[in-house]
Amino acid sequence: MAKKSMINKANAPQKFTVRGHNRCKLCGRPHGYMRKFGICRICFRELAYRGEIPGVKKASW
């Protein structure tokens, strides 16, 4: 079990706000994050395939 001081330190607000990481809002994945949509590439692909993201469709050229 952690010391009470270590628990308080972990729960304290961060000293530097820049250290925050972007994570997917659906699954919490830290990599492959698409800032415009706020989700990772895998969740984006699934939602786009089901047509749940308005304005997104499969590209063809």
Curated annotation (Swiss-Prot):
Cysteine-cysteine disulfides: none
Keyword Magnesium: no
Cofactor notes: Binds 1 zinc ion per subunit.
Cofactor(s) required, per the database record: Zn(2+)
Domain of life of the native organism: Bacteria
Annotated Gene Ontology cellular component terms: cytoplasm; small ribosomal subunit
GO molecular function terms noted in the UniProt entry: rRNA binding; structural constituent of ribosome; zinc ion binding
Pfam families with a match to the protein in the record: Ribosomal_S14
Annotated keywords: Metal-binding, Ribonucleoprotein, Ribosomal protein, RNA-binding, rRNA-binding, Zinc
Gene Ontology process terms (BP): translation
Residues at which Zn(2+) binds: 24, 27, 40, 43
Sequence similarity: Belongs to the universal ribosomal protein uS14 family. Zinc-binding uS14 subfamily.
HAMAP family per UniProt: Ribosomal_uS14_2_B (MF_01364_B)
Assembly information from the UniProt record: Part of the 30S ribosomal subunit. Contacts proteins S3 and S10.
Function text: Binds 16S rRNA, required for the assembly of 30S particles and may also be responsible for determining the conformation of the 16S rRNA at the A site.
Protein name as catalogued: Small ribosomal subunit protein uS14
Source species of the chain: Desulforamulus reducens (strain ATCC BAA-1160 / DSM 100696 / MI-1) (Desulfotomaculum reducens)
